[in-house]
Regions:
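Residue-level signature of mid-helix packing/kink "hotspots" within the transmembrane helices
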Residues: 11-19, 103-104, 206-210, 214, ...
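Conserved MFS/SLC helix-loop-helix module at the cytosolic interface between two early adjacent transmembrane helices
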Residues: 16-52
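Helix-breaking motifs and short loop linkers at transmembrane-helix boundaries and internal kinks
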Residues: 29, 50-56, 224, 246-247
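Structural signature of the two symmetry-related core transmembrane helices
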Residues: 32-46, 227-242
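Cytoplasmic helix-loop-helix junction between adjacent transmembrane helices
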Residues: 60-98
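Helix-loop-helix hairpin linking two adjacent transmembrane segments in secondary transporters
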Residues: 94-139
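C-terminal membrane-cytosol helix-exit motif in multi-pass small-molecule transporters
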Residues: 128-147, 340-344
C-alpha cells in the first residue's frame, strides 16, 4: 500500500497541474517556463538521494510529479511552435516516438542496474546525469518569439479547450483499455497460461509504434487527420477483441495463442502509434495559436484520466471476474469511442477547425 501511495501521488500531481500548465504556457513565454519545470524535475533526483525519511521522499515525488506535468505539456507545445505547420504531424510523431523509447529504455535500464547490484543512489545519479544532458539539449532549442498576449478574464476555456471536449471524451474512452493493457497484460498472460516472456509484449508494441510513426505523421500533414484516427480505431477495436479471445485460443493451441498474443501487441502499437500524432494535431487545429498550451494540456489530461480509470476498472473487473472479461469490456469501450468519433468528433472537428 505504501508503494501504491508513492506511485499514485506522482501521477495525481501531474494530472492536477496539467490544465494550469496549459494556461501558464499560453500566457507567458513558453521556453523559460519549460526549462524551469525541467530544472525542477531534474533536481528532484538529487532530492531522492538526500531524502532521509519516507515523508520527505513522498514530498519530492509530488514536486517531481507537478514538474513532470508541466514539462510534458511544455515540451509538446514547444515542438508545435518550432515545427512548420506543413510538417507538424510528422514532427509530433517523431517526438512521441522519442517519448515511447524513453519510457521503454528508462525502466529497463533501471532494472538492469539494480539487478547488477547497483545501489539506488547510483541509479538516481544516473537518472540525474541523463536529465542534465536532456536539459542542455532543451536549452539549445531555438523557439520563435511569442508576443505578449492580452490578459483575458479567467474563464474555463483558459484551462480546457472547450471545442476539444468531444475529442477528449473519445480519447478518454480509448485510453481506458490502454491503461488496462499496460498494467495487467502480464497478469492476464500468466492467468491463462502463456509461458513465453511477457516482457516481449511491450517490445512488440514499441516496434509497432516505431513502424507507424514512419508514415502516419506524413499522412496527417496531408490533412487526413480524421481518416487516420478512424483507421487506427478499427485496428485497435480488432486487437482488443483478439486479446480477450486469447483465453479461448489457449485451450485449443498454446503456440497459436502465443503468436496471436504477441501479434496483438504489434497491432496495438501500430494502431495507437498512428492515432497519437493525429489526435494531438486535431486538438491543436481546434485552438488559436495563443491556446496551443491549453490544447496540449486538454489532450494529455484526457489521455491520463482514461489511463487512471483503466487501472482502477481493470483491476476491479479482474477481481470480481477474470482479466479476459476486463479486456472484453475494454474492447466494447473502443467500439463506443469509434462510433462517437465518427458520429460526433469528426463532424465537430471539420466544423470548428482553424487550420
Amino acid at each position: 500500500s505504501t508503494i501504491g501511495i508513492i506511485l499514485s501521488c506522482y501521477t495525481v500531481a501531474a494530472l492536477c497541474i496539467r490544465p494550469f500548465s496549459g494556461y501558464f504556457l499560453d500566457s507567458f513565454a513558453r521556453k523559460p517556463l519549460y526549462l524551469m519545470a525541467y530544472f525542477i524535475f531534474m533536481t528532484m533526483f538529487a532530492g531522492y538521494i538526500i531524502a532521509g525519511s519516507l515523508t520527505l521522499f513522498i514530498m519530492f515525488r509530488i514536486i517531481q510529479g507537478v514538474s513532470f506535468g508541466m514539462v510534458t505539456v511544455g515540451g509538446n507545445t514547444v515542438v508545435i511552435d518550432i515545427m512548420p505547420s506543413s510538417r507538424r504531424g510528422e514532427g509530433l510523431g517523431y517526438y512521441g516516438l522519442s517519448n515511447n523509447i524513453a519510457m521503454a529504455v528508462g525502466p529497463m535500464s533501471g532494472l538492469f542496474l539494480h539487478d547488477a547490484g547497483m545501489s539506488f543512489t547510483t541509479i538516481f545519479c544516473c537518472s540525474l546525469g541523463s536529465c542534465m544532458a536532456g536539459f542542455v539539449c532543451a536549452s539549445l532549442v531555438k523557439t520563435p518569439y511569442k508576443p505578449p498576449v492580452r490578459r483575458e478574464p479567467i474563464s474555463l476555456d483558459r484551462f480546457i479547450l472547450l471545442k476539444g471536449i468531444p475529442a477528449g471524451i473519445s480519447l478518454l474512452l480509448l485510453s481506458i483499455p490502454y491503461g488496462m493493457t499496460t498494467n495487467y497484460v502480464a497478469m492476464y498472460a500468466k492467468q491463462i497460461g502463456i509461458n513465453a516472456t511477457t516482457g516481449f509484449f511491450f517490445t512488440f508494441m514499441a516496434i509497432g509504434m516505431a513502424i507507424s510513426r514512419i508514415f502516419s505523421g506524413k499522412i496527417v500533414d496531408r490533412g487526413k487527420i480524421t481518416q487516420v484516427i478512424s483507421a487506427g480505431l478499427y485496428l485497435v477495436v480488432f486487437s482488443f477483441f483478439l486479446l480477450s479471445a486469447c483465453v479461448y485460443l489457449i485451450s485449443w493451441n498454446n503456440m497459436v495463442c502465443t503468436i496471436v498474443f504477441f501479434s496483438v501487441a504489434l497491432l496495438l502499437g501500430v494502431g495507437f502509434g498512428i492515432m497519437f500524432p493525429a489526435y494531438n494535431t486535431l486538438f491543436v487545429n481546434l485552438a488559436p495559436n495563443s491556446q496551443r498550451g491549453t490544447a496540449t494540456s486538454t489532450y494529455l489530461t484526457s489521455w491520463d484520466v482514461g489511463i487512471g480509470i483503466g487501472m482502477l476498472t481493470g483491476g476491479y473487473i479482474a477481481e470480481v471476474s477474470t482479466f479476459d472479461k476486463a479486456y472484453l469490456f475494454g474492447a466494447c469501450l473502443t467500439i463506443v469511442s469509434m462510433l462517437y468519433f465518427n458520429g460526433k468528433v469528426a463532424p465537430n472537428y471539420h466544423k470548428n477547425k482553424l487550420r
